[in-house]
Design a protein with these regions (language model features):
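Juxta-kinase regulatory segment immediately upstream of eukaryotic protein kinase catalytic domains
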Residues: 1-23
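Activation segment signature within eukaryotic-like protein kinase domains
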Residues: 176-177
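Terminal C-lobe "cap" of eukaryotic-type protein kinase domains
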Residues: 310-314, 320-334
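Conserved short submotifs of the Hanks-type protein kinase catalytic core
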Residues: 140-154
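Conserved N-lobe ATP-binding subsite of Hanks-type protein kinase domains
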Residues: 42
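A short, aromatic-enriched beta-strand patch in the conserved N-lobe beta-sheet
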Residues: 133-134
Length: 412
């Protein structure tokens, strides 16, 4: 859709309204259906009234962002898994680390969405959901992101460690894994670490194309390095090095581990690491014991064990995964070359990009408010002039402020 134009449009005065037939409008988009609920709002299917194209619109309720920031959670443990009482744990340590670093996330409730926008607006890949437009509804305190429609939803419903899902077919497992692999290779080639690879963030289009989404946890080190600080992501998909107290790790191997956990889920319909709390899951990951239920597939299990290798320094790389016999189907399947897959180069995303990504919206809000006040003043002046004119026409007296006095009704 619109491949010739890669720019992101900003609509600063979009509002939610009702259409003539009683439907819901968001700016120039007609809401067709509700696709699901995210951490910060609802995801809709919507149709452009200008082009007729159908998109997904991702809602960000600013109040929810502020509440999450005030609670100090900022995308910590997900899936409703309770923390053990009396332990600060991994995510408390993360918050302490972020505060020590003076991280923007601690003082700016829009930090997460600004990071996602700054990265998303520069990406162009067939297996990454593209951002087209940002809509700002100041009346309802909501931001909307217009993105590629992936109306078939997540590739697999495995949002919690005790969840069971239908295993994917061998054909779909291979297809969707290679789609995700190409997306991850593209990101890593641009120096972007996703940090939240999981089935929930792998969505399917109507044509069964997998698109990677959700860059709220992603980073792109300005110095071109590969080191990341602090734990991030969803516990069941975290690499073991993230479950330790290390303040700095290499980002790419952690993403590969997470993709390996996803592949395990595709094949077996469950996750390899389980627990009723975040800490139980971390203990399971740290123990490093992986069982392989179902029929034995030597090539597949070799790939899984190498992707979920505990040592990040010896974990399999993306280039090695490309040549793995399970991926190549023993030489009968060929991926697009790395040069073709990564041909759209991304400019380095700086802190300035993150800070200024919403500036087109924020800059114009004072101007909008000023125009609103000007309209009120003009209306008052117009009303006064009209009152003066009516007084002249009817020869009616005026009060001290120039308003027409009402004559007393004659007594009966």
């Amino acid at each position: 859709m619109h491949e010739e134009d890669t720019s992101v449009k900003y609509s600063v005065t979009a509002e939610v309204s009702e259409s003539n037939d009683g439907g819901m409008l968001v700016g120039d988009y007609t809401i067709l259906d509700e696709l699901g609920h995210g951490s910060f709002g609802v995801v809709y299917m919507a149709k452009s009234r200008k082009t007729g194209e159908v998109y997904a619109i991702k809602e960000y309720n600013k109040a929810n962002l502020r509440k999450r920031q005030q609670m100090g959670m900022m995308r910590g443990a997900r899936g409703g898994m309770p923390m053990r009482p009396g332990r600060g744990g991994l995510f408390a340590a993360r918050q302490m680390l972020l505060k020590q670093q003076g991280n923007e996330e601690d003082s700016d409730p829009f930090y997460l969405i600004k990071t996602e926008l700054a990265i998303s607006k520069k990406l162009k890949h067939p297996h990454i959901a593209r951002l087209y437009e940002v809509l700002n509804d100041t009346k309802h305190d909501v931001l909307y992101l217009v993105i590629d429609l992936c109306n078939k939803g997540p590739v697999q419903e495995l949002s919690s460690t005790d969840a069971k899902a239908s295993p994917l077919s061998a054909e779909d497992t291979h297809k969707y894994f290679t789609h995700a692999l190409l997306a991850l290779e593209y990101l890593h080639e641009q120096g972007i670490i996703h940090r939240d690879i999981k089935p929930d963030n792998m969505l399917l289009t109507e044509d069964n194309v997998l698109k990677l989404t959700d860059f709220g946890e992603s980073i792109m080190p300005e110095d071109g390095g590969h080191k990341v600080k602090g734990a991030s992501g969803t516990p069941a998909f975290m690499a073991p090095e993230l479950c330790q107290d290390a303040s700095e790790i290499t980002g790419e191997p952690a993403d590969i581990w997470s993709l390996g956990v996803c592949l395990y889920g595709f094949v077996y319909g469950e996750l390899p690491f389980k627990g009723s709390t975040v800490f139980d899951i971390i203990d399971s990951i740290s123990a490093g014991e992986i069982s392989y239920p179902g029929p034995y597939d030597e090539q597949l299990q070799n790939l899984l064990s190498r992707m979920m290798e505990r040592n990040p320094d010896t974990r399999i790389t993306i280039s090695e995964i490309r040549g793995h016999p399970w991926v190549t189907q023993n030489g009968t399947f060929e991926l697009p070359s790395k040069e073709i897959n990564c041909q759209h180069i991304v400019d380095t995303i700086t802190k300035e990009d993150v800070d200024n990504v919403l500036q087109p919206i924020f800059d114009i809000i004072p101007l909008i408010n000023a125009f609103a006040k000007l309209r009120i003043i003009r209306r008052r002046i117009r009303d006064k002039h009209e009152a003066e004119q009516r007084a002249k026409d009817h020869d009616l007296p005026e009060d001290s402020e120039g308003n027409t006095k009402k004559q007393k009704e004659p007594e009966e």
